[in-house]
Every structure is written in structure tokens, then in C-alpha cells.
Amino acid sequence: MAKELIGNDWDQILNPIFTSDKYHELHNFLKKEYSTRQIYPDMYHIFTAFKLTPFNKTKVVILGQDPYHNPGQANGMSFSVMPGAQLPPSLRNIYKELYDDVGAIPVNHGYLKKWADQGVLLLNAVLTVPYGHANGHQGKGWEDVTDAAIKALSKRGKVVFILWGRFAQNKIPLIDQSKNFIIKSSHPSPFSADRGFFGSRPFSRCNTALINFGETPIDWQLPEKVSKSDLI
């Protein structure tokens, strides 16, 4: 068994990856990267999504591409930013659709931990990024980890996969659609939100699918303020 990297059932699920030669290469690459330049998130938050949402608690996956690459933003959860950080444009659009869809009042922070605590795995396909260099760690080995997570959840079944944009939708072949439910649309980025994201009602559709699976729906309303006890 590999050293516990996450601290919950994901360690066992991902053990074949964590004990592989390719992951060892990724680990060595990251050690050098973190020691020589600014990488986001900090190394203590790389596995935040997995830590907050154990395998056996995951009901929903919202798949992103890679972390935000500017200071004070990335926290290990896709689309989420640290409290106090300016809301990224994509997240502003997510909040707009959230209000239009289920009436959730937009908040002034982008800290999505409440979703993760309810079983929403906020997963980026690539878990680290160099400062100012979007997709800078693509193809270095993270995809093996996150693809394995998607496959394991798909095999277990009764998971709602929310896939925004072409990159996320390229993961559809990993998902057994007879046992899971896929919600897809254009990306919430300002460049594409008007081409199908707005009006797609992903949050209410997700909850309908969860109810059909016999699961408790997600309370999408975020707290107005983030308490210190909620910080990870």
C-alpha cells in the first residue's frame, strides 16, 4: 500500500496509480517544480477535492481543467477560489445560472466547500499549475490519477457528472451512461456561456437525477460568509 496521500477511501481506490512508476515520475517532477518556481495550489491543498469528498460520499462530479494560475485563487477545488479572492468570470456566470435555475442567492465569495461537504467532487483533471501558465502541467501524469477516479466512480454508479465545455466532455468515454447521469453544456466562461450554458439548468437537473437515484439532493445555496472553521 502506498503512503496515505489523501487520508480516506480514495487512497485505496487510487493505490494502483499512486504506486506506479509514472506517478513516481510525477512526484519527482513536482518536487522540482515546487522548489524552483511558484506552483498553485500550495502542496498542502493539491488533494483538497479528494479529502473533502470521499469516494463513498461522492454523488456529483463537477469537472474542471486545471487550477487557477494567479496568486490567492487556487484551493484544490475546481471553479472555487479562496475567500477574499475576486470572483473569476466563469464563477460569476455559474452563480448567475444558479440563481436563474434554483433561486440560490449569489454570494460575494467563491469558496465552494459547502458543495464538497455534501458530496460534490470539485475535480480538476490536472491538479497543479505554474504561476501564470494555464495548462502548464498538462500531460505530466495527473490525468492518470483523475481518469482513474472518474472510472472508479462510474463503475460504482449513481453519480451525476456535470461536464462544461469540450475538455470536460472528452471524458465521456470513461463514464458508463447506463449507471450514471451526464449533464453537459458549453463552458461558463464569458467566451462560451451564451452558447448553451445559460439556461441549461444543471443544478436542478442534477438534483432530479439524484432523487431518481435515491440520493439526497444538493443544497446549492452557499453561505453568505465563510467562517474560519470552514477553511481548509
Curated annotation (Swiss-Prot):
Its main location: cytoplasm. It is found in: Cytoplasm. It is an enzyme of class 3 (hydrolase). One of its GO terms (molecular function) is uracil DNA N-glycosylase activity. It comes from the Bacteria. Gene3D superfamilies: Uracil-DNA glycosylase-like domain. Its EC number is 3.2.2.27. GO terms for biological process: base-excision repair, AP site formation via deaminated base removal. It catalyses: Hydrolyzes single-stranded DNA or mismatched double-stranded DNA and polynucleotides, releasing free uracil. InterPro entries: UDG_fam1, Ura-DNA_Glyclase_AS, Uracil-DNA_glycosylase-like, Uracil-DNA_glycosylase-like_sf. It holds the Pfam family UDG. GO terms for cellular component: cytoplasm. The keyword Hydrolase applies. PANTHER family: URACIL-DNA GLYCOSYLASE. Belongs to the uracil-DNA glycosylase (UDG) superfamily. UNG family. Excises uracil residues from the DNA which can arise as a result of misincorporation of dUMP residues by DNA polymerase or due to deamination of cytosine. This is Uracil-DNA glycosylase. It comes from Lactobacillus acidophilus (strain ATCC 700396 / NCK56 / N2 / NCFM). The gene is ung.
